[in-house]
């Protein structure tokens, strides 16, 4: 298990608002992994499977699921709170994405990877090169243990925020789309510049019930749809509405 690091660098597959369904996961990890120490300080408190990704996971042909909790004592205010982010998060906050509506969810997906896994920011969505340029796009590219990794970010909740639990049909639709988009963006990324070793699907959900629905939806998918993708499923708590209402 990798030790928890503080990252002072910067960083998100086609950014469209994902309000009505969750992304997916395939199987919970061992309980011993869930008791990892909290991540180092920043905006919000991280706990759960911090540091759970080993270098072997980044090149393995098999998928993996990591579950994390992100608790916010108060709402994030931009730009006043930018100095509390990693340098990568600050870069993302100052860089427009490719027309998506979920900028803060992408920033805090990166913050989790930076603070828990020691990820370093490489490129934002608009900086990654694709061939053809019309390819599906991922949200950011990071460096993790010497490996380039693509990161696709989505939110798994029933919209509008606070309108009730995520339903299974919507969850299956979202998981199918997001895992499929990862295959498409990996096929389209420019091979000599930004080619990554694999991708992470970073999913944020606002309670344990929606997280469980998302995992159950992922379990219904054919393994070929999931491929070798790493699922990082983050359940947010506290004053977390800004993650789901940032348009």
How would you label these PLM feature ranges?
Residues 1-41:
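Ser/Thr-rich, Pro/Gly/Ala-heavy low-complexity intrinsically disordered linkers and tails
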Residues 36-117:
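Interdomain/boundary linker segments immediately adjacent to catalytic/signaling cores
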Residues 114-123, 219-240:
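Structural alpha-beta junctions
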Residues 114-143:
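A short acidic/basic microdomain associated with nuclease active sites
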Residues 141-153:
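Active-site beta-strand-loop-beta-strand hairpin of nuclease catalytic cores
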Residues 146-149, 196-200, 226-229:
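Loop/turn elements at helix/coil->beta-strand transitions in domains of secreted/extracellular proteins
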Residues 154-221:
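Catalytic cores of nucleic-acid endonucleases
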């Amino acid at each position: 298990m990798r030790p928890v690091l503080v990252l002072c660098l910067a960083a998100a597959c086609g950014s469209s608002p994902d309000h009505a369904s969750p992304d997916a996961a395939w199987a919970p990890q061992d309980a011993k992994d869930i008791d990892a120490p909290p991540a180092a300080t920043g905006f919000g408190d991280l706990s759960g499977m911090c540091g759970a990704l080993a270098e072997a996971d980044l090149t393995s042909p098999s998928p993996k699921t990591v579950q994390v909790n992100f608790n916010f004592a108060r709402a994030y205010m931009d730009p006043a709170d930018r100095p509390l982010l990693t340098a990568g998060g600050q870069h993302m906050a100052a860089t427009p994405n490719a027309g998506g509506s979920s900028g803060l969810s992408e920033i805090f997906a990166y913050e989790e990877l930076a603070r828990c896994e020691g990820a370093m920011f490489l490129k934002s969505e608009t900086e990654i090169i694709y061939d053809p340029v019309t390819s599906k796009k991922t949200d950011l590219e990071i460096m993790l243990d010497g490996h380039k990794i693509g990161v696709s970010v989505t939110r798994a909740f029933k919209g509008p925020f606070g309108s009730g639990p995520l339903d299974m049909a919507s969850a299956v639709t979202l998981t199918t789309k997001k895992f499929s988009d990862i295959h498409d963006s990996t096929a389209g990324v420019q091979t000599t510049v930004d080619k990554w070793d694999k991708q992470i699907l970073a999913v944020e959900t606002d309670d344990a019930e929606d997280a469980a629905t998302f995992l159950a939806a992922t379990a219904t998918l054919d393994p070929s749809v999931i491929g070798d993708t790493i699922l990082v499923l983050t359940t947010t708590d506290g004053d977390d509405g800004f993650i789901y209402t940032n348009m």
